[in-house]
Amino acid sequence: MGAMAYSLLLCLLLAHLGLGEVGASLDPSERPDSSRERTSRGKQHGQQLPRASAPDPSIPWSRSTDGTILAQKLAEEVPMDVASYLYTGDFHQLKRANCSGRYELAGLPGKSPSLASSHPSLHGALDTLTHATNFLNMMLQSNKSREQTVQDDLQWYQALVRSLLEGEPSISRAAITFSTESLSTPAPQVFLQATREESRILLQDLSSSAHHLANATLETEWFHGLRRKWRPHLHRRGSNQGPRGLGHSWRRRDGLGGDRSHVKWSPPFLECENGSYKPGWLVTLSAAFYGLQPNLVPEFRGVMKVDINLQKVDIDQCSSDGWFSGTHKCHLNNSECMPIKGLGFVLGAYQCVCKAGFYHPRVFSVNNFQRRGPDHHFSGSTKDVSEEAHVCLPCREGCPFCADDRPCFVQEDKYLRLAIISFQALCMLLDFVSMLVVYHFRKAKSIRASGLILLETILFGSLLLYFPVVILYFEPSTFRCILLRWVRLLGFATVYGTVTLKLHRVLKVFLSRTAQRIPYMTGGRVMRMLAVIVLVVFWFLVGWTSSMCQNLERDILLVGQGQTSDNLTFNMCLIDRWDYMTAVAEFLFLLWGIYLCYAVRTVPSAFHEPRYMAVAVHNELIITAIFHTIRFVLASRLQPDWMLMLYFAHTHLTVTVTIGLLLIPKFSHSSNNPRDDIATEAYEDELDMGRSGSYLNSSINSAWSEHSLDPEDIRDELKKLYAQLEIYKRKKMITNNPHLQKKRCSKKGLGRSIMRRITEIPETVSRQCSKEDKEGTDHSAAKGTGLVRKNPTESSGNTGRPKEESLKNRVFSLKKSHSTYDHVRDQTDESSSLPTESQEEEVTENSTLESLSSKKLTQKVKEDSEAESTESVPLVCKSASAHNLSSEKKPGHPRTSMLQKSLSVIASAKEKTLGLAGKTQTLVMEDRAKSQKPQPKDRETNRKYSNSDNTETNPNSNHTEELRKPQKSGIMKQQRVNLPTANPDASSSTTQIKDNFDIGEVCPWEVYDLTPGPVPSEPKAQKHVSIAASEVEQNPASFSKEKSHHKPKAAEGLYQANHKSIDKTEVCPWESHGQSPLEDENRLISKTPVLPGRAREENGSQLYTTNMCAGQYEELPPKAVASKVENENLNQMGDQEKQTSSSVDIIPGSCISSNNSPQPLTSRAEVCPWEFEPLEQPNAERIVALPASSALSASKIPGPRK
């Protein structure tokens, strides 16, 4: 038997190889037929596939992908112990189960048998069965096999069955049945079986018990299933070719048993032995073999089957074919099914792996089924049998991977961020409102002192600096990261560029140590310099943005992720090297600002603005340094909420503080009394700084020469300036004066009050003068004739009835002289002043007028009071420079000049005070010795000619000056005073003798500046406008310094010749006149309107006064002749020219002295031609000169006028 078995195996091998050789040795003529046969069989097979793949409840691989159906069937149909064994693989569960027969897993979800055959662990057994079946087909279809009987070939069949178990270890049992007749007998005649028992193979001949195969049961389904499928209806075209041709035809089509598709698969089953299930799942593979009848018709001969142990075969529930395929319970939208190999024939051998962004709430077992121990009884409920629902939950937002519900991305505090963005929006709104408020109060002194355009620029830049907090509130993106750099750098350049340039302008203007005028940095020039700075920053940002866009093309992102100490990630704008460079640039720029703050630390300013700007710059430097340090060191570990709060704190500690430092003092200063800062404040408005000289030695008139300013503003300011100069002149005159007694009195407070209010003229003065005028109009003409002698040139000016009305209706806008650069306030500001202050001013001014006009006040009292009051207010002579504070109310000239501050008193107040005192003392002594006798005669002459001049000019002035608006205040000379039309020869004669007359005869006090003395030499100023002072007798010492820069040195000799003819009364006229003339003058002041005329010339630098004698004809620059010719042309314009002139002429002291001098009358006529006008003037015209006399009285006390 062993030899026969081995020979049978060798035959099987040769038969298998022979089939391949026969197929390869076919001739070409037969191959087309073979291809056609294969094509027809493929079509037949394709038509049969739908039926083969239809779900069949009797097989376990029916198509079903719902895992819930499997769980329900296992719970309802499968015995409890069998289901537990199927899930756990524990064979102890089967020992408790009783059985009467085999149990098959039929009707469960699965795939078709044709797809199940692809399992790799079953390929060996399937191939072995197929080869054995093909061998039997070949043997039975040969001619010789027909002649042999079954009994003769029994040994060969036994050897074939034995070889199947020896050739494939997975086969546990093999059997073969053989029938002599195909369908006549229901049971086979031969039934051979080989069983593997541990290490040996048991071969049995069960032919005697083969009759039980005739019954169709589950155990005999492998035989009856194949027998029922056989039908003898197959007819082939090669049936008439003989046995040889028929054999070739069968071999070409591989026979009926030569294909794996002909193998029948049984469902997995458990065998029942001795009333219990044997452990291990089995499957039966069976295939039929056929023979040929004598007429070459194939007939069914038998079935060969093998039982395969499935205990080592894995169930792949994740696969698309095979047993229980597609029965996993993983959710494919959030998880993925992964089979687990090596667990055997058990269910649940897979795991649901959550996809990216999902996690499972708990860690589950390897096969997703809790294996039960041997003592655990299967409950049979659906919950226990069914698999757990493997639902993967999504991770927190922003987490690509997670293991639990903990967030991997930083969770933002919504309420905190909402509060921050709300407050930031409020601050931005307030910043915008501040821009509107600043524009609304653009005419206020505090706003104009800093410059409206510059303040608006700072507020706009602050609005840009508020935007980084708004950008960081949103999720970082490439656009937002780029925009963050833009708003930060542009805002920084705008705000702190403007602040630094303002400090630079203060440094250039206030700390210039030269008397020469320097190019002044106006607001427009500062804006141009700021535009250069912003343009540089803009160009850098454009280049940086271009490089960032190029990096994006190279996959270099601008937005990255940071990680906190808690391993929480967050998105952030990455920091590159350019950020370090911009931080260094900001630091260096702020260092320059700190240097400027240190340089201008001693410069006095209005509202202390440089001081506040210095605090803002230092604060920005310190806070920004801390901010950049934290940002660069902790940026990758600082979560977005902290970064937002860092930007928020940095913004408000710098930007908000800067805005507060610049705006709060401006709006809060109006409520404080600025009297303490009278001598130290200096406005730095671009108009003020550009329209004032650098020092007092620069001509004050040159401050207005190149600006299209309002002449009224100029006159208002100059009137106050001349009043201050008068105070200093009187102080120097009484200093060390041997003619005055040294006597201390108790009226020092009166002097202080005079000095404090010396530049203030309240409305009460006008009302008081108007009341006195009504009472003393009857004798005003007689008093006026005595006064005209002192001021004959006043009659030639435009002084008349309009001055009287203007003085009554005028509201003096400046109540007090704040400092060097005081501003002229509007009528609205005046009306809102406190009543207590006006009452105090009224009392003070009444006391001032009484002190100046009273006969009982001795000269000694004047000396003491004025000396004490002057010393109580330091540096009061400093130029106010507020002439352009009202320039925004009126359109300015298109061309702006560049002028400087007059701060000479700040530099050398003590030195000049001593120098002026010495000169004034000498002047007073000489004038008093030379001018006592000829004084009455000179006064009579002056009275006559001043009356005639006033008669001619009064009607025109009355008509034209009433048309002026009465809002402006101040009694100032016009910038161009026309000669009287009644005396045209005077103009021509003045032009002809310009080079011949002696300066000493006209203005003797001006020669003091040309003589060597203790007065420090001061450089000459440039082209200027000579504006006449109110009274030459009262301010020769102060005016001499201004005019000394323009006097020719040849005037020294002529001055010495006529110097002795000056009388004391000409220098100090108030000492010789009584109280009555002063009272008359005070009564007439209210009748004299003081509307300042407008010199409407296009070029303000060409406006010169034509007064030659003691203020009426002041000294002219080298272009004096051309200016005089222009005056003659303007005289022909008649009333229009007279309308533009308003003057408070002074008493020509030089002319009086010339009348008393021994010089011929003709020389005096050349100097003062108006004194020799025809005397045929009507007597009624003498009364017209009284307003001029009253104006003289008003000019004697110029202090309270402002």
UniProtKB/Swiss-Prot annotation:
Compositionally biased intervals (Polar residues): 944-958, 975-994, 1132-1144, 1151-1162
Residue span of motif VCPWE motif 1: 1002-1006
Organism: Rattus norvegicus (Rat)
UniProt short sequence motif VCPWE motif 3, positions renumbered to this chain: 1167-1171
Protein name: Metabotropic glycine receptor
PTM sites of type Phosphoserine: 694, 705, 708, 865, 946, 1061, 1076
Keyword terms of this UniProt record: Cell membrane, Cell projection, Disulfide bond, G-protein coupled receptor, Glycoprotein, Isopeptide bond, Membrane, Nucleus, Phosphoprotein, Postsynaptic cell membrane, Receptor, Repeat, Signal, Synapse, Transducer, Transmembrane, Transmembrane helix, Ubl conjugation
Subcellular location, principal: membrane
Glycan-modified residues: 98, 143, 215, 274, 333
Compartment annotation: Cell membrane; Postsynaptic cell membrane; Presynaptic cell membrane; Nucleus
Cysteine disulfide partners in this protein: 99-272, 481-573
GO molecular function, one term: transmembrane signaling receptor activity
Cross-link (Glycyl lysine isopeptide (Lys-Gly) (interchain with G-Cter in ubiquitin)): 774
Membrane topology of this protein: Multi-pass membrane protein
